[in-house]
């Protein structure tokens, strides 16, 4: 990408890295570091024409999520959750595809919360 002076990277963070999540401190800290790394890398690689962004999913309907249930189900009914449902993996894929596309060629160093 550096040699071509063009490219895009999308890291996967989590809204848990943006918000405090009950009983999820370590997970939240790790995902917050992904957000910080994204912004640092975006600054470092912009001179090479490489964009770096991050998608931060909210609670997703996956087998792992069903097994761990890190997010309190009551949160889904509170005002903290923008939508009262779990996301689907395909919705995250759409956000990643957008950030990798030329439609997002003026977006760099951003975190797109998909929740």
List each model region and its residues.
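Conserved SDR Rossmann-fold cofactor-binding beta-strand/turn motif
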Residues: 51-61, 100, 113-115
